[in-house]
């Protein structure tokens, strides 16, 4: 049986720019309330007692991170990220070589709920592979004609899930799978896809659909609404 209740390290790839936000400032440094999106995302991880360290992979030319309180936080380590997400995650994993389990969380996903995080972390009691937070697809899904704004066909939504983060895996397994997948030229869109490529089947842990990733300008107001609602609920 897998080890239980071990301390967990987290990796947050934050070297991207996010051009779809249509701003000069990288999206992770946009503010919601009195904190940046990155700060909201990291603090949600550190709020759980099992998460003892967070490694943030930033762009080598990043001058904004040093201005944040996170830069002096005793549980934060900063590493240089790479050109692609997988490169940044690997850099983060190298910084926590002794960790047994690691979370990987999007820098621009600030609305993580603690009950979702707790359910995800609990899978380490019985799993040797790990899993991800995910939300069942509820809308009707259409596949488009290649290169056209026209419907090709309807996709059966049964058993379809939206992949969320955090994603949670044994550190050595994730490192080995990412390294192999990249070396063999596989397309890696998230950490789970690297494990899938290597023949593993991570668990799906249902999470809240409001755990959104801020990708487009309209997402900022929505994330602010969700965060404000959560704060009010916690104070009630």
Curated annotation (Swiss-Prot):
Gene3D superfamilies: Spore Coat Polysaccharide Biosynthesis Protein SpsA, Chain A. GO terms for biological process: isopentenyl diphosphate biosynthetic process, methylerythritol 4-phosphate pathway. Keywords: Isoprene biosynthesis, Nucleotidyltransferase, Transferase. PROSITE patterns: ISPD. The record marks 157, 213 as: Positions MEP for the nucleophilic attack. InterPro entries: IspD, IspD/TarI, IspD/TarI_cytidylyltransf_bact, ISPD_synthase_CS, Nucleotide-diphossugar_trans. Homodimer. Belongs to the IspD/TarI cytidylyltransferase family. IspD subfamily. This is 2-C-methyl-D-erythritol 4-phosphate cytidylyltransferase. It comes from Salmonella typhimurium (strain LT2 / SGSC1412 / ATCC 700720).
